[in-house]
């Protein structure tokens, strides 16, 4: 009998340990305001169509984070659309690979950060404006970008345009109060090379969508390198009208990385703007659900971002007050200084601001695994099995959480001191303070130039 109880107790312990999750979503997420949205997402037979609109900074514009989010969110769904595309290289930005756009005639490009008073901007962040009627864009779509058949092409634009004669217009969407329109074409010859000409002086192009099927799951990522939330909020009235044009089921906002390094942050004004946008979108788009991901932990140029934790607090507070979903990516990574672990493990780029493909993929897996765990716990009847990649995510997080922080574990650097840069200081003034040439500080910190920033940590050699 005693042996029986010992075996039963051991089984109970093993069962309990199997239920323990490294990723305790309750600590850094709030999904209850997304209940109806998540039920639709994970009921594909009842709700076959589902649209996600993801807006943010360079983390979103890049390929890897959004690509992995799209793949994980669309599991067991019909996902036959590329999502929002823009020829970023045409406006001196980056990517996307596999989308070639050759511009002829006169075009003016711009984005939220570089307003020129000539071009307008949509939620995609970028635009191209034709200065004459002969302006043209020749497109080439490679299979590395979109492997499915290009049966449909959707275009966000303003003004009249001309497209190849083999393209038939199927649908043209306009929304009152929104300057942007969406035109959907049938590509009758399924070709991957076509031309788009401006049909009027002032024609504007905002984005492209490729599809082999117009039904099913859609994930549109609209990112802008260097973007801050305050850049987007400048046109809040336009955005709420454009949101009606998109009509998404779920909107995800991912800002805060660039603001975290802003040395001139008006914290009160920032939070008021966050609140204003949330209330406006709640009022104008009640059929959509909204979610925010907090910025990841970073350390660009060896600086501690002074407003990173402020961003996290503001977004969490306003999400709770306004009924938005929330995910604290900073905490899920491991909290303050966790960037050093991600860097050592090869997940983070050497700029200590962006992540490698493996890092972005892991972050996407963390977000979606957390959502799936919430759905399984809340609705046991939903057939959502735990996938192998979810267990692998748990294992990777366990190794990160239990790993010693390299910043604390590293031996002290011999013959060096640390100086935290203050506002107004230069390399020369710091060098004079310590009685050494500024070039010695440059060399000790691998600085290419003389630009330094408040909050940046510098090694000062003896």
Regions found by a protein language model. Give the residues of each.
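Conserved, compact domain cores that house catalytic/ligand-binding motifs in diverse enzymes
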Residues: 48-56, 61-65, 216-321, 325-327, ...
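Bacterial Sec-dependent N-terminal signal peptides
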Residues: 1-23
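Solvent-exposed, polar/charged alpha-helical surfaces in well-ordered, non-transmembrane soluble domains
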Residues: 63, 67, 71, 241, ...
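Catalytic His-Asp segment of secreted/periplasmic serine-dependent ester chemistry enzymes
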Residues: 236, 298-407
